[in-house]
Amino acid sequence: PGRTLVNVPPCFSEYAFFASLAQTRVVDVWRDPETFLPNEEALVAAAREASLVVLTSPNNPTGDVAPLALVRRVCEACPGLVLVDEAYGEFAEEGASAEALLAECDNLLVLHTLSKAFALAGARCGYVIAAPDVVDALAAVRQIYSVNVLTQAAALVAVECREEFSPVVAQIRAERTRLFEALSRIEGVRAWPSEGNFVLVRTARASRVRERLRDEYSILVRDFSYAPGLADCLRITVGTPEENGAVIDALAALVADEAAAEEGGAND
């Protein structure tokens, strides 16, 4: 009680959920409904009263990166801690990481995971970079045996061999650009630029389109239509060139079919 978490939705929802479990007040600073970019002035103002500000960068599911100038302003304004979750950070362009600010912002934490770029989602392993006193405080409340030895061994190999993953990440970046550009050309689809390994799109009857992608094409995408601020939005993960080509063709066909069906129904 008495603590405040500042959240920037639409974003990864678990932080707000666990804050509520801990009886922490959640203040939502909503993103622009058209661009999904943060309202910078409102965010800095809210940060002045915050115990913790959480920024996901690249943001899930919108894909935008928090500008370093904004992160610095939030750190300067916030009397508490500022957490930048960079779970998808390896897919962003070089120079986007908030790690560059750690030396000047002693209330900044940068969170990473091996679940995304390193394909170790099942290992449930990540790490945080922060000032020594912040790390000591986190260590004091860390669950006992929080990372088992098998996960530690797998994580060590992944980090030591990180260059082996670089070609895969580079291909995902290139395919992300191709996927975004192709989706943007489909009539009836809006796509947002992304620095993650996914692209967010909006189309009419998104939930039905998602079901038809699954049932008729065996293609799975994430339906965010239920989430506040994300009406009719789908998140499409970047796959192989062949998979991306298949989803582009399937989505174009289904969106056209749904539009024709809606027009036919209107004329009946």
What feature does the model see in each segment?
Residues 1-55:
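PLP-dependent aminotransferase-like
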Residues 172-173, 177, 183-217:
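Conserved PLP-binding catalytic core of the aspartate aminotransferase-like
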Residues 69, 215-216, 226-268:
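PLP-dependent enzyme catalytic core of the Aspartate aminotransferase-like
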Residues 16, 107-185, 190-191:
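PLP-dependent aminotransferase class I/II
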Residues 20, 37-48, 61-82, 86-117, ...:
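Active-site pre-lysine segment of PLP-dependent enzymes
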Residues 26-30, 52-58, 82-86, 192-194:
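Short beta-strands and strand-loop turn motifs
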Residues 80, 107-108, 189, 219, ...:
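Short, conserved active-site loop motifs that form the nucleotide-linked donor/cofactor pocket
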